Amino acid sequence: MNGIYFSGTGNTKYCTEALAQATGGSAVSMESREALEVLRASDEIALGYPIYFSDIPRIVKAFITEHAAMFRGKRVFIIATMGLFSGDGAGLASRLLRKCGAAVTGGLHLRMPDCIADVKLLKKTPEENRALIAAAQKKIAQAANAIKRGIYPKDGLSFLHRIAGLFGQRLWFKMHAKKLCERLKIRTE
């Protein structure tokens, strides 16, 4: 399966490439010129993105909506990477993709080292980060083997996941993100 991803830190790139390679494909960044050709040429793709404050990045929303016609009839497997927990990380894109006429085959949530350094809960030691990566590698290998047998993981796609994502995180994180933005101070001197 070929993959298209957005990756700010390299985590989602790593995970999407690993799943694509394990299922006989390759992966490209949605920011590259090749992304639209991969989307056009593939009947089935993996779409990977990070979760930002329990939400889908704007660039991913824009990619899906701007190329909605190209997603029609495609089978899409969603990979969502996160620092902690997202609830419905895969469900966020799933709802958009279904509106475009895509068939969402499944979802895979992968915890990876986080890049946010000012939230104590997200800070990890190097050993903890290595353990997160090892667990993600194992989960990717298991998912790839299942996909080869026609069994797709369904992380983040149920109604309960949606409730957990909305009430457990998204509402709180939006308020928290606003506070962080208000505290941001930039010196122009």
Where in the sequence are the language-model features?
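Cysteine-centered iron-sulfur cluster-binding motifs in ferredoxin-type domains/subunits
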Residues: 184-189
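FMN-binding flavodoxin-like domain, especially the glycine-rich phosphate-binding loop
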Residues: 1-3, 7-14, 20-34, 41-49, ...
